[in-house]
Amino acid sequence: MRLAIILLLMTTIVLTIGSPLHGAKCSSSNQCTRPCRYGGGTHGKCMNGRCRCYG
């Protein structure tokens, strides 16, 4: 039981930390709210309410 709780916590932490790497949330005007640095890309494209990076 304890292992399941630890795995759940780790997954939550990874998702929370990992989400900004894949791009910030998009603004109401469908623009990225912050520059994209993941994968060497400096620009982002909004997809499903999230910013996707491209070089």
Curated annotation (Swiss-Prot):
Per its UniProt record, what InterPro entries does this chain match?
Scorpion_toxin-like_sf, Scorpion_toxinS_K_inh
Which is one GO molecular function term here?
potassium channel regulator activity
- Cystine residue pairs: C26-C46, C32-C51, C36-C53
Q: Where is this chain's protein located in or outside the cell?
A: Secreted
Q: Which domain of life is it from?
A: Eukaryota
Q: What tissue specificity is annotated for this entry?
A: Expressed by the venom gland.
Gene3D superfamilies named in the record: Knottin, scorpion toxin-like
Instruction: Provide this UniProt record's keywords sorted from A to Z.
Output: Disulfide bond, Ion channel impairing toxin, Neurotoxin, Potassium channel impairing toxin, Secreted, Signal, Toxin, Voltage-gated potassium channel impairing toxin
GO CC terms of this entry: extracellular region
Region forming the signal peptide: 1-18
Indicate whether NAD appears among the record's keywords: no
Similarity remark:
Belongs to the short scorpion toxin superfamily. Potassium channel inhibitor family. Alpha-KTx 12 subfamily.
Role noted for this protein: Blocks mouse voltage-gated potassium channels Kv1.3/KCNA3 (IC(50)=0.3-30 nM), when the channel is expressed in Jurkat T cells or in HEK293 cells. Also shows a weaker inhibition on mKv1.2/KCNA2 (IC(50)=56.9 nM) and mKv1.1/KCNA1 (IC(50)=485 nM). Probably through the inhibition of both Kv1.2/KCNA2 and Kv1.3/KCNA3, the toxin also reduces the free calcium concentration in Jurkat T cells, inhibits the activation of Jurkat T cells and reduces the release of inflammatory cytokines interleukin-2, showing a strong immunosuppressant effect.
Q: What else is known?
A: Negative results: does not block voltage-gated sodium channels Nav1.4/SCN4A, Nav1.5/SCN5A, and Nav1.7/SCN9A.
Q: What is known of its domains?
A: Has the structural arrangement of an alpha-helix connected to a beta-sheet by disulfide bonds (CSalpha/beta).
The entry's protein name is: Potassium channel toxin alpha-KTX 12 Sp2
Lineage of origin: Eukaryota, Metazoa, Ecdysozoa, Arthropoda, Chelicerata
